[in-house]
Amino acid sequence: MDKRWIGILIVLIAGLGCMYLIVSNSNSVGSAVSVINDVTITLPPGYITSEDTSNMCVLHNKQTNETIRIRCLDDGADYINEYNNRLKSLNGEDDIDIQKNFTNKTLSMIKYENQSSTDKKDITLVFFEKCKHTFSMQFEHFTNETNQEKMMNFIIDTLKYDFKQNTG
């Protein structure tokens, strides 16, 4: 075998190794995606899309009954204003017990308990901006707060601008 063929085999093996590492560490390669306006979202493992419109997507985990509602708000909406408006409306209701609320540089979050409802007892609302859009996420039926934060970070990290939707 010629030295050129050995070099070609080494480059080929290195290329295949790099492709394997890229695919194994990617959140979107080989995963299901959904589109909200012109932004794609990668579905977390174990979740399916139970409702899908142009500006909203509902993700559901059948094993744990956890539900995530992701909504793209109006184009001119500011996530801090949306957060303040929602917090003000929740404070006005008697049967709502707000457990946690905060705002940082990337998102605003309200965690509350609805005393009068048996179906949606613990609800967490998250408002944030990404890809020139304002989004709200609503988490329902989550019993593990660590898992909820993990799903929230996964969704925010995998939101990507979908260039295929805007080809003109």
Regions found by a protein language model. Give the residues of each.
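Short, hydrophobic/aromatic-rich segments at coil-to-beta transitions
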Residues: 28-32, 54-57, 103-113
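Surface-exposed amphipathic alpha-helical segments
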Residues: 45-47, 135-168
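Signature of long, low-cysteine stretches enriched in small and polar/charged residues
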Residues: 88-135, 142
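Secretory pathway targeting signatures of secreted, lumenal, and periplasmic proteins
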Residues: 36-85, 113-119
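Hydrophobic membrane-insertion alpha-helices, especially the h-region
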Residues: 5-22
